């Protein structure tokens, strides 16, 4: 059996742009990935709303453990052995309060990839790594999100360029999610159900190519 760890944020968790609820397992892209690949594969979901590459939230309403780099080593140990690790983070790093460039965010993503490469828990069976650049924000994101993200739409279009460079530097696999998925037109950041299903099928094909 092949074990695939999917590490990400709310679009891996399955956040519905309609009402903020969680899509059921058979709708989330990870569920579609499992269904498409079949019983010979074990898909491990590790999505968390608000997760970043390396920054924790601050303030009275801050949610704990949002920094991916703070928890990733533990997660890798918990789910070993692994054959493939997918990493799709960076959208939450675009929040105005963090004031980060996409290049800085890509460095955060690179650190996560290096944590897999250098993990003492994966030495005997090093997994392949797939770095996924996040989708583009819709320019007309809802008002509540504009207060948090500002004009992050332009920055989000830079993800693929910088993430691909990281993948090339580290000799790992790369996928641009924006070539396959678009966020909800009504909300602008999260994916509708049909996009989850579409992306799950894309990932199934990519994972098969990597693990052949």
Predicted regions and their residues:
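Serine-esterase "nucleophile elbow" of acetyl-processing enzymes
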Residues: 1-49, 54-59, 74-79, 85, ...
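Acidic, polar ligand-binding/catalytic clefts
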Residues: 62
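Alpha-helical cap/lid subdomain in secreted, periplasmic
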Residues: 65-212
